[in-house]
């Protein structure tokens, strides 16, 4: 069971800026869902996540914990220490209440995103970026990875999703990518001090 993959705060910020600049309503919900779907598709096609981190099966669907924590920190003015060096406070402007949007004030650092990261983010934005809240909730609730997490931890308010479940019911799966993910994960556990492209 893989419930957390390594993540790079700078890459996460770049992905968030990229998404926020390309969707019409860059809310916490929309940014989180597009990044989740980006990882969901990228893992199936390439055997590694774009962003990684920990995903939880929350009532409105899968949520990347680090994205949620970062966006909540921007709202409250209390950004987590792992993001202090990213300059995120000057790169995304929080606007509106009670459902704030996150408007990019800087361009993403494209050097942190690979060609395949950009390919999949563009694909996911084109396919899901115009979907409304209810359609995204309904779709992500139907994914086996979401349902299995809720079944494994029925009493939890934020059950952890298993990355291995991302392959089930995923039409983007390329043969061999699950094994590649497992091998990359094993390497990241063996060499935690190194940032691996997992």
Predicted features and spans:
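Domain-edge interaction signal
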Residues: 1-198
